[in-house]
Amino acid sequence: MQDLSLEARLAELESRLAFQESTIEELNVTVTAHEMEMAKLRDHLRLLTEKLKASQPSNIASQAEETPPPHY
């Protein structure tokens, strides 16, 4: 009787392990897909930031363009 319960417990553990391995593999695929998507989004964000900076002139004048303060 003891052997049967040990065999049943072992079978249950093996079944759980198989499901866990399957779940881990699915999660790995999902995480990998998310990492790839995030890399694409980072690239798009970088490009959009560069375009935005290029299209907007800076409101801050360079030191050569600045007029000296009135007390000079």
From Swiss-Prot:
<feature type="region of interest" description="Disordered">
    <location>
        <begin position="52"/>
        <end position="72"/>
    </location>
</feature>
<comment type="similarity">
    <text>Belongs to the SlyX family.</text>
</comment>
<protein>
    <recommendedName>
        <fullName>Protein SlyX</fullName>
    </recommendedName>
</protein>
<dbReference type="InterPro" id="IPR007236">
    <property type="entry name" value="SlyX"/>
</dbReference>
<dbReference type="Pfam" id="PF04102">
    <property type="entry name" value="SlyX"/>
</dbReference>
<feature type="compositionally biased region" description="Polar residues">
    <location>
        <begin position="55"/>
        <end position="65"/>
    </location>
</feature>
